[in-house]
């Protein structure tokens, strides 16, 4: 898992409002890397399996919302490989690569969402280009 932690560090450095994030397997939701210590990403194994399955049909997600780390989020926006969730002053961006799902939970006003999205999508592009 340790090699993947560098990607976690890159995302959190690019968008300091990212409080917790993880890289999980797209097929089964297994955790490849995640934030630790005070900002540990704490989604359960079952929750991650359910979450990665949302990418099978993202068009259905806005009607149902999404759950991550025990929190239910409204999902105002999805794209082919992106899910954006929002709840009060927190939110998440999740993107799918060829073999992974990147999930970044952030805190802050709406203005920080663009920075978080850019950090997550930049890592998505990098991993896709690297074959992941």
From Swiss-Prot:
Gene: pfn-1
Function: Binds to actin and affects the structure of the cytoskeleton. At high concentrations, profilin prevents the polymerization of actin, whereas it enhances it at low concentrations. By binding to PIP2, it inhibits the formation of IP3 and DG. Also binds to poly(L-proline) and phosphatidylinositol 4,5-bisphosphate micelles.
Keyword Oxidoreductase assigned: no
Subunit structure: Occurs in many kinds of cells as a complex with monomeric actin in a 1:1 ratio.
Name this polypeptide is given: Profilin-1
Tissue: Expressed in the nerve ring during late embryonic stages. In adults, expression is seen in the neurons, vulva and somatic gonad.
Record keywords: Actin-binding, Cytoplasm, Cytoskeleton
GO annotation terms (biological process): regulation of cellular component organization
Record GO cellular component, one term: cell cortex
Localization per Swiss-Prot or TrEMBL: Cytoplasm, Cytoskeleton
SUPFAM superfamilies assigned to the protein according to its UniProt record, in alphabetical order: Profilin (actin-binding protein) (SSF55770)
Coiled coil region boundaries: none
Keyword rRNA-binding: no
Main location: cytoplasm
Alphabetical list of PROSITE patterns matching this protein: PROFILIN
Family of the protein in this entry: Belongs to the profilin family.
Alphabetical list of Pfam families matching this protein: Profilin (PF00235)
Domain of life of the organism encoding this protein: Eukaryota
GO-annotated molecular function: actin monomer binding
InterPro entries linked to this entry: PFN, PFN_euk, PFN_sf, Profilin_CS
């Amino acid at each position: 898992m340790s090699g993947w932690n560098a990607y976690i560090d890159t995302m959190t450095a690019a968008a300091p409002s990212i409080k917790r994030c993880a890289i999980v397997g797209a097929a089964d939701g297994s955790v490849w890397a995640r934030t630790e210590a005070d900002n540990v990403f704490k989604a359960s194994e079952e929750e991650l399996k359910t979450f990665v399955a949302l990418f099978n049909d993202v068009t259905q997600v806005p009607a149902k919302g999404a759950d991550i780390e025990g929190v239910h989020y409204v999902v105002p926006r999805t794209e082919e490989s992106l899910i954006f969730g929002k709840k009060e002053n927190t939110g998440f961006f999740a993107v799918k690569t060829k073999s992974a799902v990147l999930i970044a939970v952030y805190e802050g006003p709406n203005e920080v969402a663009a920075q978080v999205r850019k950090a997550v999508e930049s890592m998505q592009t990098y991993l896709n280009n690297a074959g992941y």
